[in-house]
């Protein structure tokens, strides 16, 4: 079923009063009833934003001619089997935060990753799919998914790693996030000026049979792997931690913005790198 021609000034105000957030204005809303229909709309209406939780779309004063609402596609779920978790694109950050198996999986990394994202009211609305699809550099969630070697499932692109998705150029429908059940040490960290602020630096680390993989995000760009630093650590071991941390300067590009300068981010990234590596080394 597809609805057209609903006046967004009325519907939008009702939605946003319930959420207590900024105004979202649109002229028309499309509510596809199938994945096929949703994807076709995304391809046809290239300028129409996809409305998941709507927490970012509503920022600013723009009035959208059309939005595509995914709430009728049945994508709000968290499932698991013996080998993986599957997080539907419309599952909220709060759903992930309180999901019982995530309290212990990866040493509680999922609740830790989302607990400082604004307030509970926001996390009740912000979706996991929207958080990943937006590919914001300041994301708390993406560094964790990289460390967990998570994948996404797309309507057209199929399954691909989150790392590959960060560079995926097509407009495609994100259906779910897939997290393998691997018992490997991971750690995450996000640095903020205040509890409710956006982070000015994020990081994550994974240690498995192939060695260490450390990702630095909010540079303020998207998270990337500190390749040279990890190579030094994997070749020389933990005794070369200081040398590896210094290699971040040539590995990762930082920029300045209103949250932090490039120089400050670099300094903090070196210290974060050392803390993250030491944390996974304490895992038994």
Enumerate the predicted regions with their spans.
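C-terminal structural segment of proteins
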Residues: 2-284
């Amino acid at each position: 079923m597809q609805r057209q021609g609903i006046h967004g000034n009325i519907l939008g105000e009702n939605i946003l009063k319930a959420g207590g957030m900024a105004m979202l204005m649109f002229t028309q809303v499309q509510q596809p009833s199938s994945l096929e229909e949703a994807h076709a709309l995304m391809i046809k209406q290239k300028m129409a934003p996809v409305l998941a939780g709507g927490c970012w779309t509503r920022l600013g004063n723009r009035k959208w001619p059309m939005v595509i609402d995914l709430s009728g596609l049945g994508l709000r779920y968290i499932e698991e089997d013996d080998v993986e978790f599957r997080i539907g694109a419309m599952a909220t950050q709060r759903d992930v935060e309180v999901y019982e198996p995530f309290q212990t999986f990866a040493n509680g990394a999922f609740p830790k990753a989302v607990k400082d994202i604004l307030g509970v009211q926001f996390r009740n609305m912000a979706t996991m799919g929207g958080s990943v699809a937006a590919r914001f550099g300041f994301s708390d969630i993406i560094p964790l998914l990289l460390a967990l070697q998570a994948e996404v499932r797309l309507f057209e692109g199929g399954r691909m790693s989150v790392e590959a998705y960060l560079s995926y150029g097509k407009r495609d429908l994100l259906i779910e996030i897939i997290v393998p059940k691997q018992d490997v040490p991971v750690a995450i960290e996000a640095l903020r000026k205040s509890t409710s602020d956006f982070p000015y630096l994020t990081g994550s680390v994974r240690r498995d049979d192939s060695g260490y993989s450390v990702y630095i995000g909010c540079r303020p760009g998207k998270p990337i792997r500190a390749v040279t630093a990890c190579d030094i650590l994997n070749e020389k071991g933990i005794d070369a931690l200081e040398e590896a941390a210094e290699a971040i300067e040539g590995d990762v590009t930082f920029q300045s913005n209103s949250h932090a300068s490039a120089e400050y981010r670099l300094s903090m990234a070196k210290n974060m790198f050392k803390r993250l590596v030491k944390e996974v080394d304490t895992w038994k």
